[in-house]
């Protein structure tokens, strides 16, 4: 049985990955901050560790590849890393991979105000996972995209920009959705579905 370390210090992100990727025995409502030994995908056991990694600028693919390679060296084994971006179509996909810094600097209200002068409120949520088997190994990329629009903040604001993103075909923001619903349509789900298929094929 091989072990893959999901590298994150974000408890909310970890819970979603548990709910989507790990075994059906895992309760997605669990408040645990670490994965149990029952979390298996095919021949792999998924564990988790928080690792301080240098942040680089570039496309989301470049950022993910760098993060996976750096994490594999620290862990000295197979790792799974994730990078998420939110792109406003009116801004040619900005903030993109820099969304975390936008949230920290101008907040959710500031992000909504960026689009005040634009009719086009459409946006895309992009999740990119990188899997690396170990130091100096090739990084495999798995990406999921969910289209939607930017709206005034609705719902809990404790998970990034979830409260201002309303996916197409729904009247609720990510933050307002039941977790099971969100985890069946989100950009993270779509990317992890590809990760799962890959791991099961190994």
Swiss-Prot record:
Binds 1 divalent metal cation per subunit; can use either Mg(2+) or Mn(2+). Its cofactor is Mg(2+); Mn(2+). It comes from Candida albicans (strain SC5314 / ATCC MYA-2876) (Yeast). Its EC number is 3.6.1.66. ITP binds at residues 8-13, 67, 83-84, 100, 159-162, 182, 187-188. The keyword Nucleus applies. This is Inosine triphosphate pyrophosphatase. It catalyses: ITP + H2O = IMP + diphosphate + H(+); dITP + H2O = dIMP + diphosphate + H(+); XTP + H2O = XMP + diphosphate + H(+). Pfam families: Ham1p_like. CDD domains: HAM1. GO terms for molecular function: dITP diphosphatase activity; ITP diphosphatase activity; metal ion binding; nucleoside triphosphate diphosphatase activity; nucleotide binding; XTP diphosphatase activity. GO terms for cellular component: cytoplasm; nucleus. Pyrophosphatase that hydrolyzes non-canonical purine nucleotides such as inosine triphosphate (ITP), deoxyinosine triphosphate (dITP) or xanthosine 5'-triphosphate (XTP) to their respective monophosphate derivatives. The enzyme does not distinguish between the deoxy- and ribose forms. Probably excludes non-canonical purines from RNA and DNA precursor pools, thus preventing their incorporation into RNA and DNA and avoiding chromosomal lesions. SUPFAM superfamilies: ITPase-like. GO terms for biological process: deoxyribonucleoside triphosphate catabolic process; nucleoside triphosphate catabolic process; nucleotide metabolic process. Keywords: Cytoplasm, Hydrolase, Magnesium, Manganese, Metal-binding, Nucleotide metabolism, Nucleotide-binding, Nucleus. Homodimer. InterPro entries: ITPase, ITPase-like_fam, RdgB/HAM1.
């Amino acid at each position: 049985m091989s072990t893959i370390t999901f590298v994150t210090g974000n408890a909310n992100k970890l819970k979603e990955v548990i709910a989507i990727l790990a075994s059906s025995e895992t309760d997605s409502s669990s408040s645990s901050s670490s994965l149990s030994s029952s979390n298996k995908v095919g021949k792999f056991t998924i564990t988790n560790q928080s690792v301080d990694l240098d942040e680089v600028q570039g496309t989301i693919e470049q950022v993910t590849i760098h993060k996976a390679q750096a994490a594999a060296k620290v862990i000295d084994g197979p790792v799974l890393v994730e990078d998420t971006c939110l792109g406003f179509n009116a801004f040619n996909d900005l903030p993109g991979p820099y969304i975390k810094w936008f949230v920290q600097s101008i907040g959710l209200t500031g992000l909504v105000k960026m689009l005040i002068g634009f009719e086009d409120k459409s946006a895309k949520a992009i999740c990119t996972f990188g899997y690396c088997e170990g130091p100096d190994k090739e990084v495999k990329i798995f990406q999921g995209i969910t289209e939607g629009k930017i709206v005034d903040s609705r719902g809990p604001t404790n998970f990034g920009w979830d409260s201002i993103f309303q996916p197409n075909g729904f009247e609720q923001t990510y933050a307002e959705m039941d977790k099971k619903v969100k985890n069946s349509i989100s950009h993270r789900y779509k990317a992890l579905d590809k990760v799962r298929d890959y791991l099961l094929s190994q």
